[in-house]
UniProtKB/Swiss-Prot annotation:
GO terms for cellular component: chloroplast; chloroplast stroma. NCBIfam families: fdx_plant. This is Ferredoxin-2, chloroplastic. GO terms for molecular function: 2 iron, 2 sulfur cluster binding; electron transfer activity; metal ion binding. Residues 47-137 form the 2Fe-2S ferredoxin-type domain. It comes from Zea mays. The gene is FDX2.
Length: 140
């Protein structure tokens, strides 16, 4: 009965105004919820990324907004890394086919990128891609 009385009193209450604590909570909550809805509605591409490692080949479905190294680690794949910022060559690999966006890296020069070198810590897939990993010694 108390629950019914409480809900009935809420229904009979006058419409909330901006000075009402309830209205204030609603006004604050709406802007926080809106970005989450937009994020959930964002279309996201995923690409087949094949990593050719010394231990064998691994295929992953990597989202287009996640670094290849980060996703591989989440899946339990051990890849070399050091800086995680694209400013060294520890995670260097060689693109066999496909393409990546590695505009966040600062170590490789234009010729090395054109030759297919990739830093997996700063590379997003932009198509299905095959990458030979553990190639730092070949790069240097």
């Amino acid at each position: 009965m108390a629950a019914t009385a409480l809900s009935m009193s809420i229904l009979r209450a006058p419409p909330p105004c901006f000075s009402s604590p309830l209205r204030l909570r609603v006004a604050v909550a709406k802007p926080l919820a809106a970005p989450m809805r937009r994020q959930l509605l964002r279309a996201q591409a995923t690409y087949n990324v094949k990593l050719i490692t010394p231990e064998g080949e691994v295929e992953l479905q990597v989202p287009d907004d996640v670094y290849i190294l980060d996703f591989a680690e989440e899946e339990g794949i051990d890849l070399p890394f050091s800086c995680r910022a694209g400013s060294c060559s520890s995670c260097a690999g060689k693109v066999v086919s496909g393409s990546v966006d590695q505009s966040d890296q600062s170590f490789l020069n234009d010729n090395q990128v054109a030759d297919g070198w990739v830093l997996t810590c700063a590379a997003y897939p932009t198509s299905d891609v095959v990458i030979e990993t553990h190639k730092e010694d070949d790069l240097l």
